[in-house]
């Protein structure tokens, strides 16, 4: 990588409640813990990492649009419940054409029927689900490897 790579981690609705919300489904790790670990891993690889969480679809869309202006090279996104409902998130991700990985803490395919469909997965570079918080670390490793090609 000639310039320092820039990776944005986007967290959707209710992920600010990690650690306390349904820990049997999502684990006990907090969002702050996840972001801290990712920051350490990114720093060790000389990668710029920024994070953003919102419970509001429009704010997520605005941040993704800004990512294009900011020159972000890769996005890691856990869209939360918007995975199953948001054509608008799909459209903005397709529109900015920044490669991205979709991450889910739980295995969405083992859950309720309505959670089994993702509006994003067919345009994502990859999907990681069901591995808990380590899924974010794997997504970061994959993003860095892709950017180093």
Curated annotation (Swiss-Prot):
GO molecular function, one term: 3-dehydroquinate dehydratase activity
Site (Transition state stabilizer) residue list: 21
Pfam family, one: DHquinase_II
PROSITE patterns: DEHYDROQUINASE_II
Pathway linked to the protein: Metabolic intermediate biosynthesis; chorismate biosynthesis; chorismate from D-erythrose 4-phosphate and phosphoenolpyruvate: step 3/7
Catalytic activity reported: 3-dehydroquinate = 3-dehydroshikimate + H2O
GO terms, biological process: amino acid biosynthetic process; aromatic amino acid family biosynthetic process; chorismate biosynthetic process; quinate catabolic process
Catalytic center residues: 26, 104
Superkingdom field: Bacteria
Alphabetized UniProt keyword annotations: Amino-acid biosynthesis, Aromatic amino acid biosynthesis, Lyase
Annotated EC: 4.2.1.10
Annotated residues for binding of substrate: 78, 84, 91, 105-106, 115
PANTHER family: CATABOLIC 3-DEHYDROQUINASE
Function in brief: Catalyzes a trans-dehydration via an enolate intermediate.
Self-association state and partner proteins as the record states: Homododecamer.
Family statement drawn from the similarity comment of this UniProt entry: Belongs to the type-II 3-dehydroquinase family.
Protein name as catalogued: 3-dehydroquinate dehydratase
Taxonomic lineage of the native organism: Bacteria, Pseudomonadati, Pseudomonadota, Betaproteobacteria, Burkholderiales
Gene this protein is translated from: aroQ
């Amino acid at each position: 990588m000639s310039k320092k790579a820039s990776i944005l981690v986007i967290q959707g609705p209710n992920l600010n409640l990690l650690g306390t919300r349904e820990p049997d489904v999502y684990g006990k790790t907090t969002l702050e813990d996840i972001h801290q670990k990712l920051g350490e891993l990114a720093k060790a690889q000389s990668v710029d990492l920024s994070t953003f969480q919102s419970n509001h679809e429009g704010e997520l869309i605005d941040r993704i649009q800004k990512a294009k202006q900011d020159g972000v090279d890769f996005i890691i996104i856990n869209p939360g419940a918007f995975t199953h409902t948001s054509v608008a998130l799909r459209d903005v991700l397709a529109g900015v054409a920044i490669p991205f990985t979709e991450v889910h803490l739980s295995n969405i395919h083992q859950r309720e029927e309505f959670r089994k469909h993702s509006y994003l997965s067919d345009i994502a570079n990859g999907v990681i689900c069901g591995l808990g918080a380590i899924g974010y670390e794997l997504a970061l490793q994959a993003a860095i490897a892709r950017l180093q090609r």
